[in-house]
Design a protein with these regions (language model features):
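Extended, low-hydrophobicity, polar/charged segments
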Residues: 1-214
Length: 214
């Protein structure tokens, strides 16, 4: 692990904030525990891509936009990650995902499904989803580390694989050697290798699909 503190106004208050530290550590502890190498960059909050690019411009990695959506009934949730310079309107998204009418998920749903607030949506939030899979009756497997299921989960909200979230990923990320996401808080960015990202998805164990986004 490599940690770098970037210049920025008021950066110290974010580094010293215990809640921010806990959210970030939840991700970095998981990566370290599972042998996924990463670089951690601390910076002021980056709530928009425009602001983020000011800090990302000198970091060698593919940086991403991340959306969290729900279906019309509100019983299915979708995470979408794609290269940050691309634009994707909701009608195009509905066509590509083939999941019916979609809308942006509320902050309450973000917290429940990914453990994040608006502006910090990230695939690393799928750690929150790891403890939702329902084991077979005779299974003695322990729940994954660092899982904190906040409330009971209705079976109707789960996909067939026992997870609440389906993940759609920009297929161009397959070609990226290094990929950057927030570690569940927008005061930091984590860079992992393509192989590390794929290993993370395997550990998550949910359903993901590569999609073309122009």
């Amino acid at each position: 692990m490599k940690e770098i503190i970037m210049d920025g106004e008021g950066i110290e208050q974010y580094i010293d904030d215990p809640e921010i530290t806990m959210r970030i550590a939840r991700v970095t502890d998981f990566l370290e525990a599972n042998g996924i190498d990463f670089e951690l960059y601390r910076h002021p909050p980056l709530p928009t891509i425009e602001k983020a690019l000011e800090y990302w411009k000198n970091l060698s990695a593919t940086h991403c936009k991340n959306l969290f959506m729900r279906n019309h009934k509100g019983n299915r949730h979708y995470l979408i990650s794609f290269e940050c310079h691309k634009n994707l309107d909701i009608h195009t998204l509905e066509h590509k995902l083939r999941q019916g009418k979609l809308s942006f998920a509320s902050e309450e749903r973000m917290l429940r499904c990914l453990g994040v607030h608006p502006g910090s949506v990230t695939p690393f939030g799928l750690i929150e989803d790891m403890g939702l899979a329902v084991p077979a009756p005779d299974s003695t497997a322990e729940k994954p580390m660092f899982t904190d299921v906040r409330q009971d989960v209705s079976v109707r909200e789960l996909f067939a694989n026992g997870h609440r979230v389906k993940f759609f990923v920009d297929e161009d990320l397959k070609m990226s050697e290094r990929i950057s996401f927030h570690p569940c808080d927008n005061t930091a960015s984590v860079i992992v290798s393509r192989e590390g990202f794929l290993k993370f998805l395997s550990l998550w164990g949910g359903e993901y699909e590569w999609i073309g986004i122009s």
